[in-house]
């Protein structure tokens, strides 16, 4: 588990397999700093077309797992046991939402989106296969909306919906996050059916050479902690 496909852009068909640790290290260490700052600058100047052009050429991951030959649903070959909750248009509440999200035990990771106006959450889940995904996504989206008091973008209900890279030096990762299943209301999930599940990939680490610029990926089971940022924000 915890392995995902990284595409150089949304129309690429040849992904690289990385871990969530790798992805969050890239978000933190500035791997996508230049395009992220360019995108945000264009948005601030109301240059929407230029901003979208930058975003369209941005690398993205498939939080649900590993894909082959594209990222359509039928390209998914193994599960990461995580899902993405996309909270958009947070504006002045962005930092507050990020801080509170980092305190949730089932949050595997959190970071400020490429626009700087939203928060991406990766949530740990426990499912047997792709047929279980719609129910747990719907229940988790409702839970997060209730706990954080915000609406979320329903696009992530599609299991292979891509998540763009970003630059956030305070990005949070907790490899020991608990499965959200235990935090959902009774009856939120329907009984599971028996079928041949999509397998979960072995938990190994693939370290891109780009990590040599100052922030190595966390080892499996460790946290990339947002505590310093949280403390400075609350004081």
Stretch-by-stretch model annotation:
Residues 1-81, 200, 206, 218:
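DNA replication initiation on ssDNA origins
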Residues 7, 63, 86, 111, ...:
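Residues in well-ordered beta-strands of folded domains
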């Amino acid at each position: 588990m915890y392995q995902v496909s990284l595409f150089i852009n949304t129309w690429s068909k040849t992904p690289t397999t990385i871990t969530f640790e790798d992805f969050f290290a890239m978000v933190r260490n500035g791997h996508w700093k230049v395009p992220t700052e360019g995108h945000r600058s264009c948005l601030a100047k109301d240059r929407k077309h230029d901003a979208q052009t930058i975003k369209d050429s941005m690398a993205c991951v498939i939080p649900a797992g590993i894909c082959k030959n594209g990222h359509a649903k039928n390209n998914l070959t193994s599960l990461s046991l995580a899902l993405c909750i996309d909270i958009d248009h947070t504006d002045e509440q962005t930092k507050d939402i990020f801080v509170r999200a980092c305190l949730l035990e089932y949050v595997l990771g959190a970071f400020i989106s490429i626009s700087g106006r939203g928060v991406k959450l990766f949530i740990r889940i426990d499912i047997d296969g792709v047929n279980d995904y719609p129910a747990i996504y719907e229940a988790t989206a409702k839970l997060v909306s209730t706990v954080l008091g915000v609406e979320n973008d329903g696009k992530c209900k599609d299991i292979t919906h891509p998540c763009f890279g970003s630059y956030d030096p305070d990005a949070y990762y907790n490899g020991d996050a608990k499965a959200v299943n235990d935090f959902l209301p009774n009856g939120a999930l329907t009984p599971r059916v028996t079928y041949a599940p999509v397998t979960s990939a072995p938990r190994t680490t693939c370290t891109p050479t780009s990590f040599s610029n100052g922030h190595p990926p966390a080892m499996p089971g460790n946290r990339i902690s947002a505590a310093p940022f949280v403390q400075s924000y609350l004081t």
